[in-house]
Amino acid sequence: MTILVEHFVPDSRVDEKKVIEERDNELVLDGGFVVPKSKETDAFDAPDMNFLGHSFRDYENGESERQQGVEEFYRMQHIHQTYDFVKKMRKEYGKLNKMEMSIWECCELLNNVVDESDPDLDEPQIQHLLQTAEAIRRDYPDEDWLHLTALIHDLGKVLLLPEFGGLPQWAVVGDTFPVGCTFDSANIHHKYFKGNHDINNPKYNTKNGVYTEGCGLDNVLMSWGHDDYMYLVAKKNGTTLPHAGLFIIRYHSFYPLHKAGAYTHLMNDEDRDDLKWLHVFNKYDLYSKSKVLVDVEQVKPYYISLINKYFPAKLKW
C-alpha cells in the first residue's frame, strides 16, 4: 500500500504540489485508511509489492527468515491434514461448545492472534479485517453483506487461542485444499504432500477420490482451519448472509481453486456463480494489507449495525 511521506524540497510550493498529487491518487476511507486509486477506474488498484518490499504471496524468497518459517508451516500442514483428521476436527468443533460471544467481541479477541502462514501481514488481525472491509465498502457501497463478510472472514483464527484448544498453526491458517482426493500440483509447496498418509490410499489418491464430478463444494471436505470453522459457526448460528457470503468465508483461502483454477471438476452451478464474488473479495483480502491503520472506533458503529442485521446478538463458538 502507499504511505504518504513528505520529502524535503527547498521550494515549499513544489513540496505542497507533490503531496496534493499523491493524495489525488489515493482513496481515504471513513476510518482514515488509505488505499491506492486507479486513474482509469477511480477504484481500488492492487499494488505490486507488500510492505516488506516483496511480491504478494511470495513463497519462493527462501532467503527471508519469515519465508523459511512459512515453508516449514506448509510442510507440517501438508503432512498432517488428512481426511480422517478433518472429519475428527469437524465433529469436535461442530459442537460449538467453546464459548458464547458476539461477533464484535470475537473481532477484539482476534487481536491476540498471529498468523505465521501469511508472508504479507504483521499488523493486528482486526486491522486486516477492517482494511479489507473498508476497501470493499468504498467500491461496493450497496453490498453491505460483502462488507460484513470481509469483517468476519478470518474470525475462525481464534482456534489458535487457548480458550479454543490452542490448535497448532497448521490446523488453523494457510491455504486450504480438498481432502479425500488427489492433492493437486497447484497447492503451494506441493512436494510436502509426500509425507501425507492419504497419498498412498487408493480411496483418496484419484482425481475424484470419494467425491463425484460436479458434486458441489458444499459436499467436499476441506483441510481443517479457520475458514471451515467460521463457516460452521455462521451456518449453525442462523446467519442471514447470502450463500455467496458463506462461500467466501469457507473458500477464501482455497487459492488452488480461485487463483490456479484447480478442482473445478468438483464444482456445481451455484459454486460457479459464487466464485465470481470470491474473485472480487480476494483482490481486497490480499492487497489491502497495509501499515496504514483504520480508526477502529470511527467505523465500529457501522459494522455493529451490520452484525445486528445478519447475526444474533450472541453466537455459540
From Swiss-Prot:
Subcellular location: Cytoplasm
GO biological process: one example: L-ascorbic acid biosynthetic process
InterPro entries, sorted: Inositol_oxygenase
Keywords recorded for this protein, A-Z: Ascorbate biosynthesis, Cytoplasm, Iron, Metal-binding, Oxidoreductase
Any one cellular-component term (Gene Ontology): cytoplasm
Known EC number: 1.13.99.1
Cofactor: Fe cation
Chain sites annotated for binding Fe cation 2: D154, H226, H252
Cofactor note: Binds 2 iron ions per subunit.
Gene disruption phenotype: Incorporation of the inositol pathway-derived monosaccharides is strongly reduced in knockout AtMIOX2 seedling walls.
Any one Gene Ontology molecular-function term assigned to this protein's record: inositol oxygenase activity
Tissue: Expressed mainly in roots, stems, flowers and siliques. Low expression in leaves.
This protein's pathway: Polyol metabolism; myo-inositol degradation into D-glucuronate; D-glucuronate from myo-inositol: step 1/1
UniProt: Fe cation 1 binding residues: H128, H153, D154, D285
Reactions this protein catalyses: myo-inositol + O2 = D-glucuronate + H2O + H(+)
Binding positions (substrate): R57, D115, E116, S117, K157, G174, D175, H252, S253
Keyword Transferase: no
Functional description taken from the UniProt entry: Involved in the biosynthesis of UDP-glucuronic acid (UDP-GlcA), providing nucleotide sugars for cell-wall polymers. May be also involved in plant ascorbate biosynthesis.
PANTHER family: INOSITOL OXYGENASE 2, MYOINOSITOL OXYGENASE
Family: Belongs to the myo-inositol oxygenase family.
Protein's recorded name: Inositol oxygenase 2
UniProt lineage: Eukaryota, Viridiplantae, Streptophyta, Embryophyta, Tracheophyta
